[in-house]
Amino acid sequence: MSLIAAAIAIGLGALGAGIGNGLIVSRTVEGIARQPEAGKELRTLMFIGVALVEALPIIAVVIAFLAFFS
């Protein structure tokens, strides 16, 4: 049962991060296409947003390890 819980935690964490990263990057590309002069600021904010979204799978892996080893 703990294997299933670990797999679900990692899978949903990766799914959420993939969707979130895709949305962030697509909106950034749209913004840069509209205002090329704001590209540097948008790119910086994009990397901050992607880093925050990537925290989700890391937390999911920790939860999966806790479920697997407890």
Curated annotation (Swiss-Prot):
Transmembrane spans: 4-24, 45-65
Entry keyword annotation includes Kinase: no
Key words of the record: ATP synthesis, Cell membrane, CF(0), Hydrogen ion transport, Ion transport, Lipid-binding, Membrane, Transmembrane, Transmembrane helix, Transport
Main location: membrane
One GO CC annotation: proton-transporting ATP synthase complex
UniProt-listed SUPFAM superfamilies: F1F0 ATP synthase subunit C
Site (Reversibly protonated during proton transport): E54
Molecular function GO terms recorded: lipid binding; proton-transporting ATP synthase activity, rotational mechanism
Compartments in which it is found: Cell membrane
Regions annotated as coiled coil: none
A Pfam family it matches: ATP-synt_C
Bilayer topology annotation: Multi-pass membrane protein
Record's subunit section: F-type ATPases have 2 components, F(1) - the catalytic core - and F(0) - the membrane proton channel. F(1) has five subunits: alpha(3), beta(3), gamma(1), delta(1), epsilon(1). F(0) has three main subunits: a(1), b(2) and c(10-14). The alpha and beta chains form an alternating ring which encloses part of the gamma chain. F(1) is attached to F(0) by a central stalk formed by the gamma and epsilon chains, while a peripheral stalk is formed by the delta and b chains.
HAMAP family linked to this entry: ATP_synth_c_bact
Biological role stated in the UniProt entry: F(1)F(0) ATP synthase produces ATP from ADP in the presence of a proton or sodium gradient. F-type ATPases consist of two structural domains, F(1) containing the extramembraneous catalytic core and F(0) containing the membrane proton channel, linked together by a central stalk and a peripheral stalk. During catalysis, ATP synthesis in the catalytic domain of F(1) is coupled via a rotary mechanism of the central stalk subunits to proton translocation. Key component of the F(0) channel; it plays a direct role in translocation across the membrane. A homomeric c-ring of between 10-14 subunits forms the central stalk rotor element with the F(1) delta and epsilon subunits.
Family designation: Belongs to the ATPase C chain family.
Protein name: ATP synthase subunit c
